[in-house]
Each structure stands twice: as structure tokens, then as C-alpha cells.
Amino acid sequence: MGYNVSGLTSYVETNKDVLVKDAVLGGNIKGETLSMFTKQLGVKTKERLNYLDVDPVLQDGSSCGFSAQGSTVLTDRDIETAVIKYNDQWCWKAMLGRFSEYQVRINANEDSLPFESEITDQIVKGINKKVETLIWQGDKDDGDLINGLITIAEGSDSASTITGATASGATAYERILDTYMLIPEAWVDEAVIFVSPAIFRQYAQDLVAKNFFHYDGENGELTELFIPGSDVKVRKTYGLTGVDKIYASVPANMVYACDMLDANEDFKMWYNDEDELVKVKVLFNAGVATLYPDAVVLTTPAA
């Protein structure tokens, strides 16, 4: 028994780095946020994130002497990944009798897949979309492979995480403003507010109604807007589609863990001469965590 792997690998191998990077970093999808995350590489299954917090104390230096003051706190937090795969296969003969049969050559050496580049492109986009949803909405208790940021915030054991707070405003603008006012002062300058496309759409219309909105259309799709009177951005997040909660944090606080971004994640397509099937295999690991619970605000709408 043997395999003929020379048929379809040329397209995938030539672009392998692009395919792998796009598939695990959210390339070329609408509203992706994974590229904003801090990356923790070399994580196989579970690892501790080590970080420190330094608080220097300024003293009166008008006299001689030395008095050590201040604090340096070393902290760690677990981040866990799941090994994720995608497997599929196609029989090129299934194209016979269909509109696509013009791309099929009927012979014993046929080892190509009609619309190969289109299929691989859709695979990458599909993985992007599912990973984006997983890192935000994943819940292992519901059978998902990892816990996403919403689940992590809701289950935080830190009293400093602001979760379950009610954004009492009736409009998206008022709810987002309520969330903004809950962001701790120490983090607000770097914070971003993440909302679903539905909330973002309503927010944009609320700004129009208040005459706070200006968009010239030159920058393509509208994915973020500032809160008027601040430098905090509101980000349209497709991973939050269907979620009526508002999440605010500092992007550097949001960690995406994996083994390697290119070397070990595998995107492979090949022709199996034994069963005459074209097969694809994608394999990578992924997980998310937050470093500082007190830099997270999660609000729910008023009942």
C-alpha cells in the first residue's frame, strides 16, 4: 500500500504559511479580533502565565538615607488549550453529471480536486469564523472545546472582575456609556469595548440620531467607533454574534495561547491513491485567558 501525495499539495504547500497563519489568526474575516490578542507561544496543553506588577513609591529625597519602599508582585494564572482538528474528504467522481464536471479528467491518474483553491479558501474562512466565536463564547460545560472570554469573566474567582453589572440604559449608546463608566481608571486609557454586530449597528444609529456620527466611507467596512468625548473605541466583534452582553478590557490583557503560530499547526491536503479520495487535515491547539481580572468589565442589559 502507498500514497500518492504529489497531486494537490503544490497549492497548499506553496501557500502553507499563509493558510496556517490565516486559519489560526483570523486573517481576512470580518470583525475578527484575534489579531489584537497577546500571543503566548509554546503552550502544549496547560501552562501558567507569569506576570508582575510593580508599584514604585516616590519619597522625599531632600535628606540623606535609604528607605526601600514600593512593591513588586509576581503572579501567575493558568491558561489551558485544546487540540483542535478538522478532517474532510472528497471524491472527485462525485462531480460527474454536475455543472462542475468540466474540471474533471476521467482517467486512472486523476488526482486533482475541482475548485481546489476555492475550497481551501472557504476552509480557512470557516475555521476563522468558528475560532473567533470559540474564543469569545466557548463554554466547556456546553460541550465546547475551550472556555471563551465571556465564560471566563462570568466564572472569575476574582472579586475585582466587574461582571454581572447592569447597563441600565435603554439604547445601545446608553448601555455602552454605562459600561465605559465602569472601566477602572487605571485601565481606561487602553481599553476597548467589544460588542456584537447587532449592538454595534444600533450604537452607530444612536450616534447618528445624536449628530455624533461622521463616516466618509473611504475606509471600507465600519468596524469601530470612538465613544464621543473619549479615546475608547467600541469594536464590532463577530465572535459575539448573538450575545447581548458588552465586554470591555485592554487588548494586551487578552491572551491567546497555542504551540506555534506556523511550524506545528498543520494544514495538509493530499490525494490518497488507494481510495481515490482527496483529503484535508487541519490540526492546531488554542486557548484564551485574561491576565488581570480587574481589567475586565462585563455588563448585561437591564431586565
PLM features: residue spans?
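Short coil/turn segments at secondary-structure boundaries
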Residues: I135-K140, E190-S196, D216-N219
